[in-house]
UniProtKB/Swiss-Prot annotation:
Pathway: Isoprenoid biosynthesis; isopentenyl diphosphate biosynthesis via DXP pathway; isopentenyl diphosphate from 1-deoxy-D-xylulose 5-phosphate: step 5/6. [4Fe-4S] cluster binds at residues 265, 268, 300, 307. This is 4-hydroxy-3-methylbut-2-en-1-yl diphosphate synthase (flavodoxin). Keywords: 4Fe-4S, Iron, Iron-sulfur, Isoprene biosynthesis, Metal-binding, Oxidoreductase. Its cofactor is [4Fe-4S] cluster. GO terms for biological process: isopentenyl diphosphate biosynthetic process, methylerythritol 4-phosphate pathway; terpenoid biosynthetic process. It catalyses: (2E)-4-hydroxy-3-methylbut-2-enyl diphosphate + oxidized [flavodoxin] + H2O + 2 H(+) = 2-C-methyl-D-erythritol 2,4-cyclic diphosphate + reduced [flavodoxin]. Converts 2C-methyl-D-erythritol 2,4-cyclodiphosphate (ME-2,4cPP) into 1-hydroxy-2-methyl-2-(E)-butenyl 4-diphosphate. Its EC number is 1.17.7.3. InterPro entries: Dihydropteroate_synth-like_sf (IPR011005), Enolase-like_C_sf (IPR036849), IspG_bac (IPR016425), IspG_bac-typ (IPR004588), NO2/SO3_Rdtase_4Fe4S_sf (IPR045854). Gene3D superfamilies: Dihydropteroate synthase-like, Sulfite Reductase Hemoprotein, domain 1. The gene is ispG. Belongs to the IspG family. Pfam families: GcpE.
Length: 360
């Protein structure tokens, strides 16, 4: 089985996928790609919360041509999502796209596929083969009875073979399913076939709540096996929420440790402060920081500092007041109305010791 450190490095613009321990976070815009300003505004929002690569829907030639203007001002590398029409891929490449998402077996004749491959080769643009449970060919459904992990992998390998026959190996592969166990098994099987980097995700995961859970279980399980080089959390929600979930998945697995994490107790009858409101406010305030920081927001002073002694900094509520602590040691007592501001002072002090960035 090829682990992420053993996969073939592929470059999307200046971002490396594969051949390393780190995992790249992606998303996809919801704006009409032809609307350049709206698309750029969405890309900027995604960039600001930690997205590293963004995909655009290319539904016609106007969208493909709009890529040129978007590319000129985009802070992120761009991926063109293309289905069936090889001309759109060629126009996107001429417009400066950084990566193409196609299935070679679905864009027409061998000659059309070869034209796209040669255009990608000239520009050193990778191709992502994107197979999911809904795109498995009828012959494979007849063979396996349903979109099984084996069927999805065989479908992907058929597309891979087309590119390999053209001596093209600048490839990324995704094999998504809306069924989490199927998705996990599929990536495990694929990791035994080739050392191409894998794009991991649960397709059609659902709304923000249910989709976040399905994606966390599916993506998290695959990543915990050492498999997966880039991820996209698919949610029926603002794409910014996809990035937040993706970052927490990576942080929870210690794949990245340069982002803050907020831990908070579930509250109980001893809690005498607005714990939920405070924890949410703190999480929002530290979300844009790029420092390894663990912040604890605890509901009471009975065992708050002790339970959160591994945190760098935190608060423990009391009756109209609370304790500020660092590394499990109490620093001072403050009024409840001052808890957030005093905690942010401590956080800024820690941040300033590492880099000149402030929040609050």
């Amino acid at each position: 089985m090829f682990k992420r450190e053993e996969t073939k490095p592929v470059f999307v613009g200046g971002v490396q996928i594969g051949g390393q321990k780190s995992v790249v976070i992606q998303s996809m815009t919801t704006a009409d790609t032809r609307d350049v300003e709206k698309t750029l505004a969405e890309i900027q929002r995604l960039h600001d919360v930690g997205c590293q690569i963004v995909r655009l829907a290319v539904i016609n030639e106007d969208a493909a041509r709009a890529i040129k203007k978007i590319k000129e001002r985009s802070p992120l590398p761009l991926v063109a999502d293309i289905h069936f029409d090889h001309k759109l891929a060629l126009i996107a490449l001429e417009s400066g796209i950084d990566k193409i998402r196609i299935n070679p077996g679905n864009i027409g004749s061998k000659e059309k596929t070869q034209r796209v491959v040669e255009a990608c080769r000239e520009r050193n643009v990778p191709i992502r083969i994107g197979v999911n449970s809904g795109s498995v060919e009828k012959r494979l459904l007849d063979k396996y009875g349903y979109p099984s992990p084996e069927a999805i992998v065989e479908s992907a390998m058929d597309h891979v073979q087309i590119l390999e026959d053209l001596n093209y190996d600048n490839i990324v592969i995704s094999l998504k399913s809306s069924d989490v166990p199927t998705m996990i098994q599929t990536y495990s099987l694929m990791a035994q076939k080739r050392n191409y980097p894998l794009h991991v995700g649960v397709t059609e995961a659902g709304t923000q709540f249910s989709g976040s859970i399905k994606s966390s279980v599916g993506i998290g399980t695959v990543l915990s096996m050492g498999i997966g080089d880039t991820i996209r959390v698919s949610l029926t929600a603002d794409p910014v929420e996809e990035i937040k979930v993706a970052k927490q998945i990576l942080r929870s697995l210690d794949i990245v440790n340069n982002d803050p994490v907020v831990i908070a107790c579930p509250s109980c009858g001893r809690c005498a402060i607005d714990l939920i409101g405070l924890a949410t406010k703190v999480e929002d305030a530290v979300s844009t920081l790029k420092v390894p920081l663990k912040v604890a927001v605890m509901g009471c002073a009975v065992n708050g500092p002790g339970e959160a002694r591994e945190a760098d900094v935190g608060v423990a509520g009391g009756n109209g007041e609370g304790l500020i602590f660092r590394n499990g040691e109490i620093v001072r007592k403050v009024k409840e109305t001052e808890l957030f501001e005093e905690l942010m002072k401590e956080i800024n002090e820690i941040v300033n010791e590492q880099k000149p960035t402030t929040v609050g």
